[in-house]
Each structure stands twice: as structure tokens, then as C-alpha cells.
Amino acid sequence: MFLWYNSFQTKFEIDTYLELSNNMSLCMGCMQEIGDNKICPSCGFDTTEKQQAPFLPYGTILQNRYIVGAGIDTNGESTRYISHDKQTGDIVIICEFLPIGLFSREEGTTEVRINYENRLVYNKLKDDFLNYYRILSELRELSALMNVHNIFEIQTGETGEKACESG
């Protein structure tokens, strides 16, 4: 499953040590239940650490559905985060459009500020990014491609896919 998020809202619910209903706490590194542990027994993630700018803070909730965890890779155009889908319980990947050098984000915030002199380039690249994932969404039946299920805008461009378990 691949998700996309991008809109012009700037406020999200944030909690770095996320506790869900029914007393379940999630590790922001692997999205497994960790109870009261500060270090995840599954992946070793330290729940007391904060995600560094310009990445989304741990526990950011998008669309009142997706809980954003640790950034797992970045490529100059976008950053992928491990995430939890509160609706299905699935581990998903959220991909956020974050083109290096064209924006800024203060640590601990979700608001992205587009550099004024780069706004046209930023918007063109964002449109290209969104169109790419819309095409992938239409081709979701092809097993060789990532399965894009949800594309939405909050402020920057993001997408998500269902995480595959190894083993």
C-alpha cells in the first residue's frame, strides 16, 4: 500500500512517545508495541530521541489516520518514513516531498516554509511528484510496482506503501 499526503494545513497532533487507545505504545522505529520500554526490544530504537529537522516529528498524525515514525531514507527529492495506519493496523511507508535546498522546517514542527526565490521550481517539482504517484496509483494491479492506495496533500507531497515483512 502506498500513501501520499500533501495539503496546506500546518497543524498536526504530535506525540514523540505515542500511546494509542487500549494502552498500546508504538516504537517510532519499527511500529511494534513496546509497552513501557524506552528502548524497543524489537529494533533497539530509543524512544527518548527526537527526529531531527527537516523531518516530520515522531508521532505526527496525518489525515487523523497515519502515525509517522522514523525517517528510513532520503534521496534529495523526498523522505520515506515508517508509519502506522490506525484504521487498518498496517505498517505503511509515507513518502514526503522534501527537495533539498528549496524549503526549511524548524525542528519539532510540521510546517514547511518554501524559499521565496524557489517557489516556482518547488511547485513544479511537487506537481511532477504528485503526478508520478497518481500514475502509480492507477497501475496498482501490477505486482512489480509499489501499491499506491492514498494520495493526499497537507503541505508537502507525501506518499505511502504497505511495508513488506522480511523473514
Question: What is each of the regions a protein language model found here?
Answer:
Residues C27-C30, C40-C43:
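Short cysteine-rich clusters marking metal-coordination/redox-active sites
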Residues V68-G76:
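Protein kinase glycine-rich loop
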